[in-house]
């Protein structure tokens, strides 16, 4: 198989779900897609463009870190980065998820840290609602 014949991640999921039970849905990890795209020199939008958006039922977001070499790491240890908020907003222009899941595993100093992420996401969701 040549590189041209290889499926990208979005096309892979499209092919996988094409003939699957229609009740099977996707939990889409915005941060993971963003980190993977940028670490492989792609734009987020191009990287996710072939996903079956109609199958996405849940959007998952978390913060990321940059290591000393500039490589992004999906660590769940920071508040939501501005890039993740922008990418989530882009996704919400194309997807109508039933759920949005925030994951924060480390560096939570207080409930206010978590509430800040919730408020940021709420603003994006309200913006989407006003467009509909």
What is each PLM-predicted segment?
Residues 1-10, 32-45, 110-112:
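Active-site glycine- and acidic-residue-rich loops that bind
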Residues 1-25:
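Active-site acidic/histidine proton-transfer and metal-coordination neighborhood
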Residues 10-17, 48, 56, 85-92, ...:
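Generic structural signal for well-ordered alpha-helices
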Residues 19-24, 87-99, 128:
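A structural motif corresponding to the C-terminal end of an alpha-helix
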Residues 22-36:
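Short acidic, Gly/Ser-rich segments with clustered Asp/Glu that frequently serve as metal-coordination loops
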Residues 26-28, 57-61, 98-103:
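Hydrophobic faces of well-ordered beta-strands that scaffold small-molecule active sites
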Residues 36-96:
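Gly/Pro-rich active-site loop or hairpin
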Residues 109-131:
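C-terminal helical cap(s) of enzyme catalytic domains, especially alpha/beta-barrels
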């Amino acid at each position: 198989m040549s590189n041209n014949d290889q499926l990208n991640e979005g096309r892979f999921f499209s092919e996988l779900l094409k003939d699957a039970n229609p009740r099977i849905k996707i939990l889409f990890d915005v941060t993971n897609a963003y980190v993977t795209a940028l670490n492989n020199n792609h734009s987020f939008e191009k990287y996710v463009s072939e996903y079956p958006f109609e199958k996405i039922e849940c959007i998952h977001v978390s913060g990321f870190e940059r290591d000393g070499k500039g490589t992004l790491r999906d660590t769940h240890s920071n508040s939501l980065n501005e890039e993740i908020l922008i990418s989530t907003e882009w996704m919400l222009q194309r997807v109508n998820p039933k759920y949005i899941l925030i994951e924060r595993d480390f560096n939570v100093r207080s409930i206010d840290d978590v509430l800040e992420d919730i408020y940021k996401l709420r603003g994006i969701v309200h913006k989407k609602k006003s467009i509909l």
